[in-house]
Amino acid sequence: MKSDTITRIVLVGLLAVFVIFTLLAGFLGDLYWFLEIGYEDVFLSIITTRIILGIAGFVVFFGFSYGCAIIAARTASGSLGRPAGGRQGIAALALFASLIAGLNLSAAWETVLRFFAQVPFGVSDPIFSQDIGFYVFSLPFYSLVLSFLLGLFIFAAILSALAFLFQVLVVRVRGGQFPTFDIEAETEPVWGVFFSEFLPQLNILLFLVFVALAARLWLFRYSILYSSTGAVFGAGYTDIHITLPVTTILSVVALIIGIGFLLNEKIQRKEVIIYSIAAFAGIVIIGIVAALLVQSLVVEPDEFTLEKQYLDYNIQNTLDAYDLSRAEEEIFQVNYTLTAEDIRENRATVENIRLWDWRPLKSTYEQLQLFRTYYQFYDVDVDRYMVDGMYKQVLISPREMDIGSLPSQAQTWVNQHLVYTHGYGVVMNPVDVVTTEGLPAFYIKDIPPTSPYFTIDEPRIYYGEGAASYAVTRTSTDEFDYPAGDQNIYTDYDGTGGVALDGIVKKLIYAIKFNSVELLVSGSLTPDSRLLFNRNVAERTAQIAPFLSYDADPYIVVADGRLYWIIDAYTTTDAYPYSEPVMAWNIGSGERLNYIRNSVKVVVDAYNGDVSYYIIDPADPIVSTYDRMFPGVFQGIEEMPDSLSSHLRYPEDFFRIQAQLYTIYHMKDPRVFYNREDAWVIPDELYRQQRQQMVPYYIIMKLPGEEEEEFIMMLPFTPRNKENLIGWMAARSDQPVYGDLLVYQFSKQELTYGPMQVEARIDQDTAISQDITLWSQSGSDVVRGNTLIIPIENSLLYVEPLYLEASERGTLPQLKRVIVVYNDRLTMQETLSDALSVIFEEGTGTPEGGEEPRPPISETDLERLARIADLYDRAQQALSRGDLGQYQRYFDEIGDLVKG
């Protein structure tokens, strides 16, 4: 028996040591990392706050609840003439509850810090005249404190009652008496002792419970501004006239009941407890019933009249919360008087029309520019650069390392963490240029990167979208750099990123942290070795500043001969009064919010991993609060280098939220808003023959009334249940007008074609339909790209690219035709230039229902396409066998056929 006890003690001790070492390794591993990147103050501030809150919460909760229980136990034992027992069980319950309370309080570190560092919004709510900052910063803190106290007092009352009853029952059982809970029993029942001896202490605890409840209910009054019972989100007629006064009454009644319990300490009548709780419950029920009756019998029959002012509150606050109040509305008077001269004068717009859709282009990149199976293009992004003196919109994608694609026999620890450590270079092409083979014309391509316009001195990508695992650099093992024909080129990391593994202690820490004994025993590691982790740029930035929400689409930038990532960061809350909430699936991990600002731009060096946070919206009170919480973390946007600030984009996810809300909230008149008389929707388009909602797109164009082209994001709108255009929204990205929102509305008296109406016209064109059918019959898939609506002067040009790709997997999409629609003219040509020439210069584009369709594709071309598809399949089979020589020969033959 003794040996078993010793064994258990040893096992428990070993388990405790393991847990402590694991936690310590995690803490020290993170601390070294924060020291390396220079944000240790953020880490230590958060950790310190969490520890203080956790310990304070635990000590207060345990001390009060356990103390009350011990007093109750002593009271019971004293009245029965027996010493108190069962303290271990009471202590265990108190410890468990206190641990949960401490952890919950520790998790609320951000609420506490934001309260003490808060910056006012300078705007008040329309009901209580409180600054919005009260709801965003103060109310959550007060609610946290009161919820903690309310939970503490309730638990203390329950634990004390259990402790008292336990003592009474133990004494009775030991005395041989069967305990009775009959209140009317004459032989000293349990309840008799309970109410006679424990009632004074219970009265005090219930006094504290109801005082805390009264304060909590008083705060709850402000929560009616988030009500959804009326015509809109926010307090409505019923909330103001029923819920608010009932909640106020409940708060006062709870306070009176609490005082009653305190007075009952002298009266000592158990009926006071029962009647008080019953009265409180009765008022709650009456309030609920009254609210339902008023809403259904009073409000709903005359809803607009009674809810009008609250509708107005909702409209204004929603526009403010989503930064839509500053959207400038203009009338866009459409005319169709464009000439060839107008097209030439708007050359910068025309030459930046995005013919390449990122989805087929990604497949093209993979076929032409991966070179090895362990590389990956995770995404293709849109940006703009000055190229040879011209402002050009481009598509760009980094070539990242994907160690998961290594052959199974190569999936070793050395290969995964020491050899294949980084990606290499980027691929870039202009959005409008297509080769004669239907392929992109590259600005940057190949390994090492070659370009007539750009110099990339450091093309290596150690930090990216796909860098999920850690890497160890400066080891005795050669680090793969890039392939060069049949040979591999190797390198040694020369950057500043990573934690130095300069001692056995650090190696042990990270071996535990990453559950990797190789970090401790590998002979490849040297005193100069560096451990690079948190290399995924989205996770890296969130690790440093978890209080921000991050966009799902980081994008890479070529600047000053290096590669950088730019990530949009948001400040959000769901506590803005009267603002309509939305579910933002692509922001953070998916958030419900009713306020958002794109206040921060984050830059990550792809080689060193350096992270910089720049405030782009200093008027945002939330980011100003964070700046107070963590001084030194943020820089002003004016401190961002021009080579990077020239690539800032208005984020798509933010724009989508704003555009979706604006379809309803452009109706600022409460009656029009209530009836949804002028509701808009985001239109649909065809992509791969499937109908889908149109997505916002970037474009370089000259806005109405402006002299120069600029980089904007735009999205059209159509009326609800109709297909014609009603307007479009634009967000500007260039300095100094970054962030400006413009909304252009079309005349409601004239028809302006929407995307699906243009798609219908294309489908009805016999020549286009004939070509698409022939392509499909030749074994190719026809991919219809995005329908782009291009405003030029006061006209609209519709452009849709067509791609061909083989039906099999691993295709090489080629841009084969461009469809242009203008007014009543429609044409499909091999290039955009040809299509514009047909419509504007020759003036002989095929009108809808025209009698002279273009000649179909020749049989020779069809045979050539079929041969290309066959060769491509053979090339893929050779690649899967690892026969790179045969793979190259097949592609050489494909090249000959394409050129022929």
Locate the predicted segments by residue:
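Soluble extracytoplasmic regions of secretory-pathway and membrane proteins
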Residues: 4, 10-881, 885-898
